[in-house]
Curated annotation (Swiss-Prot):
The keyword Protease is assigned to this record: no
Source organism superkingdom: Archaea
The entry's keywords: Ribonucleoprotein, Ribosomal protein, RNA-binding, rRNA-binding
Oligomer and partners: Part of the ribosomal stalk of the 50S ribosomal subunit. Interacts with L10 and the large rRNA to form the base of the stalk. L10 forms an elongated spine to which L12 dimers bind in a sequential fashion forming a multimeric L10(L12)X complex.
Gene3D superfamilies per the UniProt record, alphabetical: Ribosomal protein L11, C-terminal domain, Ribosomal protein L11/L12, N-terminal domain
Any GO molecular function: structural constituent of ribosome
Pfam families: Ribosomal_L11, Ribosomal_L11_N
Gene name, Swiss-Prot/TrEMBL: rpl11
Name of the protein described by the UniProt record: Large ribosomal subunit protein uL11
Function: Forms part of the ribosomal stalk which helps the ribosome interact with GTP-bound translation factors.
GO cellular component, as recorded: large ribosomal subunit
Length: 160
């Protein structure tokens, strides 16, 4: 039961049977379109970003598994807010504001890569990154919003 692993960088939601994917997995004899469809389905939320993808192929049965990595949290935040870079002085210079819904969207994208085991903790991790980037959440300091999350202010949003 030999397994072959192919690691490539794909534009989110835009995998094609052409390069770089085709030449990498073509020789393995698996159905190219099934692989492309699965990659595009799993990377749709990362449209416009380069996403690391790992394709693990069982060379005996021709079964495959697609594992999608995630871009760094800072890249997801900057993409969501259309920013070029974070603040040079995040303690004093606030450069943007992000909504709690956007924070939750990013937490859902990154959930498998985060240390959190629920969305309440995941959004707090994302807000921690906002602190270091000079980004407010709902017009407030992210640390204040983290306390509100602890108090249950956003429970309706986080359980939906």
């Amino acid at each position: 039961m030999a397994k072959e692993t192919v690691e490539i960088l794909i534009d989110g939601g835009k995998a094609t049977p052409g390069p770089p994917l085709g030449p990498a997995i073509g020789p393995l004899g698996i159905n190219m379109m099934q692989v492309v469809e699965e990659i595009n389905r799993k990377t749709a939320d990362f449209e416009g970003m380069k996403v690391p993808v790992k394709i693990i192929v069982d060379t005996d049965t021709r079964d495959f598994e697609v594992e999608v990595g995630t871009p760094p949290t800072t890249a997801l935040i900057m993409d969501e807010l259309k920013l070029e870079k974070g603040s040079q002085d995040p303690g004093m210079d606030k450069i943007a504001d992000i909504s709690m819904e956007q924070v939750l969207k990013i937490a859902r994208m990154k959930f498998d890569a985060l240390l959190s085991n629920d969305y309440k903790r995941a959004v707090k991790e994302i807000m921690g990154t906002c602190v270091s980037m000079g980004i407010t959440v709902n017009g407030k300091d992210p640390r204040e919003v983290q306390r509100e999350v602890d108090q249950g202010v956003y429970d309706d949003l986080l359980t939906s």
